Regions:
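Conserved glycine-rich cofactor-binding loop
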Residues: 16-17
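Substrate-binding pocket helix/loop in short-chain dehydrogenase/reductase
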Residues: 92-96, 100-105, 203
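Active-site helix of classical SDR
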Residues: 119, 153-154
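Residue(s) in the substrate-gating loop at a strand-loop-helix junction
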Residues: 137
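Short, small/polar-rich loop/turn modules that mediate ligand/substrate recognition or access, typified
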Residues: 172, 177, 233-235
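A conserved structural motif in NAD(P)-dependent oxidoreductases
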Residues: 207-218
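Short C-terminal tail/terminal secondary-structure segment
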Residues: 229-230, 235-253
């Protein structure tokens, strides 16, 4: 199916991670010119660029640092699409009464501030009809006990930030769009080793499909939302990629 993404200039932040690399591969498969962002995963980004070949480039930046984000967009040049995938899930399970302010701030920086700076940089350089895709989480919809910091950041992305951006972007370009995906439990390097089989069985009770997503499941929806052909009249929307999740298991019995 034609997506209209051939030749489009695409930036994928967090491109060396699980969902990010899947997005980069999916855009490259559609003939897009992909720039893969990384922070600490240079080796993975270089390997991915070599795998994709063609016009694929890489760029390193700490997305919580304003100057580095500005440099990233200066290096990227004109862009048509930005997939703001980069984020961080803190592995340690902490209720709010044990949550240090330092972790709270670090989690909001890595997720919400990084997404804000990425969105701002993309909109500043936008010319013509572009597409911005934010990546939230089901934690931002139904919460996540033990990770209130992460849930708060993702909720802000999927709520106030998304809905504000979709109305602001059209001031730059009348047909430009902003949408978001909300992955549920997804197999990725960020979660691998931190989630037990028992935890997966427990949370899958809330899912119609009762399985963990793969990064390519999320990437497929990112491509659909980026496509001016498939989603040209879609903006301000959140697509849940969570196997029909309806909430959280609050009590074991």
């Amino acid at each position: 199916m034609e997506t209209g993404l051939k030749g489009k200039r695409v930036l994928v932040t967090g491109g060396s991670g699980g969902i990010g690399s899947a997005c980069a591969r999916a855009f490259a498969a559609e003939g897009a010119q992909v720039m893969v962002h990384f922070h600490q995963g240079r080796d993975r980004a270089e390997a991915l660029a070599a795998e994709l070949g063609g016009s694929t480039r890489i760029v390193g930046a700490d997305l919580t640092q304003e100057a580095e984000v500005e440099r990233m967009f200066a290096e990227s040049g004109a862009l048509d699409v930005c997939a703001a995938v980069a984020g961080a899930w803190p592995a340690e399970d902490l209720p709010v009464w044990e949550l240090p302010l330092e972790r709270w701030r670090a989690t909001l920086d890595a997720n919400l501030t990084a997404t804000f700076l990425t969105a701002r940089g993309f909109l500043r350089q936008l010319e013509g009809d572009g597409s911005l895709i934010l990546v939230g989480s089901t934690a931002g919809i139904v919460g996540e006990a033990g990770h209130a910091d992460y849930a708060a950041a993702k909720s802000a992305i999927l709520g106030g930030l998304l809905l504000s951006l979709k109305n602001e972007i059209v001031r730059k370009s009348p047909l430009a769009r902003v949408n978001a995906v909300a992955p549920g439990w997804t197999e990725s390097p960020m979660t691998r080793g931190h989630v037990s089989e028992e935890q997966v069985r427990r949370v899958s009770r809330t899912m119609a499909l009762r399985k963990v997503a793969q990064p390519q499941d999320v990437a497929a929806q990112v491509v659909v939302l980026a496509s001016p052909v498939l989603s040209g009249h879609v903006t301000g929307q959140v697509v849940s990629v969570a196997g029909g999740m309806e909430g959280r298991v609050v009590h074991d019995t």
